[in-house]
Amino acid sequence: MYRLISSIASKARVARNCTSQIGSRLSSTRNYAAKDIRFGVEGRALMLRGVEELADAVKVTIPPKGRNVIIEQSWGAPKVTKDGVTVAKSIEFKDRVKNVGASLVKQVANRPTQLNRCLGDGTTCATVLTRAIFTEGCKSVAAGMNAMDLRRGIKLAVDTVVTKLKSRARMISTSEEIAQVGTISANGDRELVTDCKAMESVGKEGVITIQDGKTLFNELEVVEGMKIDRGYISPYFITNQKNQKCELEDPLILIHEKKISNLNSMVKVLELALKSQRSLLIVAADLESDALAVLILNKLRAGIKVCAVKAPGFGENRKANMHDLATLTGAQVITEELGMNLEKIDLSMLGNCKKITVSKDDTVFLGWGAGDKKAIGERCEQIRSMVEASESDYDKEKLQERLAKLSGGVAVLKIGGASESEVGEKKDRVTDALNATKAAVEEGIVPGGGVALLYASKELDKLSTANFDHKIGVQIIQNALKTPVYTIASNAGVEGAVIVGKLLESDNPDLGYDAAKGEYVDMVKSGIIDPVKVIRTALVDAASVSSLLTTTEAVVTEIPTKEDASPAMGGGGGGMGGMGGMGGMGF
């Protein structure tokens, strides 16, 4: 019995030792990230510093006398820009609490669906408004105001201003009005505003893309048809050696949903093209090497003008693109799901158009042939409904591209310049101008230069509130609405407070300060106008982010840990041993 108990005790001690060793090893492998917590006034003050420094860098770009900002890049030459979004996105702070505040403001600039991709210069306005609202909010909370009541007052004021802006909106349609909006967002450079011509060419729903040009001048290329971003599968299909393109006049168009591998079915399609004495374009998911070889041999030996391209997109998006192309060209998509195959194909299943040009990178269909206009219209309506129902930004973008190809067309703005830096800076401003004009066409315009927000602040005098803290929240917005005019005037080298005071004395809601000329003018008649959608969304987003920051009571950040310096190489007097200091490159 004693030996049995001794044996059990011995095994227990061994087990405990093993457990202790395992626990020791586990604890040594765990990496705990220590946290730093800042509460109340201290945390908000540090975040405010980050917001203020970011806003100071961004506000100098506000037109018409906006200044350049030079941004150092980790690769290549420094970037020169007058684009507030680009400036905001480039800023990071070593202090993590400051960085938290700045990062929340940058979310306004980085939100693709509302500001960056569709509203252009509104991000700069939003940043300035955020700084003004958050600054006053911090002061009020420090003075003992209830943060949640302030937030309710801010929301009440913003809703009132938005209603006022919408009631004053004027819809635009002429190219001159579109050009005026674009000029403002392009920092006053009229020469950069080619987007109004592009919009005239492709319509409201057309696609306008911006690319680097190859000359010193800006160029506009309009594709009156459908363009897909897929080129020829093989260079053997080239018919024009000079420009390295395959050009097909009055071609037949075969659209196949799957990969083509059957040689006999390929021969059947080629016979149809040969009998009708017409060229042939094949659009398919892919072609097997044997099927591709048959096409190339018939092109080289029999003289049949033929070309094959892969269908654009992936998965369901590729299938949808094929059906769009089929609707436009009058073709049927050959799909095995419906029991269709190439061996039973006839001419009625093939589409046509006036001309197709295929390059290494893309294919352009010009002049629709058998496409049914009613069917095209119905498909456009179907896609519009899908855009409204979609909640995914990516899906919406792809649907808009499809709609543009079906209904409007494609325009390409090629931005020229003497250097890469100049082209990049121009592209930033043209992108802003393009996005602002789209927003203006969508929701209309109001007098620009910040005066629409300034005069809307008068409406807040009449607003009744539930308590004193609500009233302070309304006053915070009222004061913030003056900052765009103040900043524009300050950038022009004049006293902003004087300009704001002079305008508030006026009863003319169209009167504003033309900073470019240094005089008071009727903003609408002078062509200084802003899209309602831009300033509305800028105000709503600025108030939202500022309210979040103002009601923050604790900020939790990671404490950066410095890695242990690497030991010097044996016998190495200097050189490599000094590289151990590279480990401490935390924020």
Swiss-Prot record:
<dbReference type="InterPro" id="IPR027413">
    <property type="entry name" value="GROEL-like_equatorial_sf"/>
</dbReference>
<dbReference type="GO" id="GO:0140662">
    <property type="term" value="F:ATP-dependent protein folding chaperone"/>
</dbReference>
<keyword id="KW-0067">ATP-binding</keyword>
<feature type="transit peptide" description="Mitochondrion">
    <location>
        <begin position="1"/>
        <end position="32"/>
    </location>
</feature>
<dbReference type="InterPro" id="IPR001844">
    <property type="entry name" value="Cpn60/GroEL"/>
</dbReference>
<dbReference type="InterPro" id="IPR027409">
    <property type="entry name" value="GroEL-like_apical_dom_sf"/>
</dbReference>
<comment type="function">
    <text>Implicated in mitochondrial protein import and macromolecular assembly. May facilitate the correct folding of imported proteins. May also prevent misfolding and promote the refolding and proper assembly of unfolded polypeptides generated under stress conditions in the mitochondrial matrix.</text>
</comment>
<keyword id="KW-0496">Mitochondrion</keyword>
<dbReference type="GO" id="GO:0042026">
    <property type="term" value="P:protein refolding"/>
</dbReference>
<dbReference type="InterPro" id="IPR018370">
    <property type="entry name" value="Chaperonin_Cpn60_CS"/>
</dbReference>
<keyword id="KW-0547">Nucleotide-binding</keyword>
<keyword id="KW-0143">Chaperone</keyword>
<dbReference type="InterPro" id="IPR027410">
    <property type="entry name" value="TCP-1-like_intermed_sf"/>
</dbReference>
<comment type="similarity">
    <text>Belongs to the chaperonin (HSP60) family.</text>
</comment>
<dbReference type="InterPro" id="IPR002423">
    <property type="entry name" value="Cpn60/GroEL/TCP-1"/>
</dbReference>
<dbReference type="GO" id="GO:0005739">
    <property type="term" value="C:mitochondrion"/>
</dbReference>
<keyword id="KW-0809">Transit peptide</keyword>
<dbReference type="Pfam" id="PF00118">
    <property type="entry name" value="Cpn60_TCP1"/>
</dbReference>
<protein>
    <recommendedName>
        <fullName>Chaperonin CPN60, mitochondrial</fullName>
    </recommendedName>
</protein>
<keyword id="KW-0346">Stress response</keyword>
<dbReference type="GO" id="GO:0005524">
    <property type="term" value="F:ATP binding"/>
</dbReference>
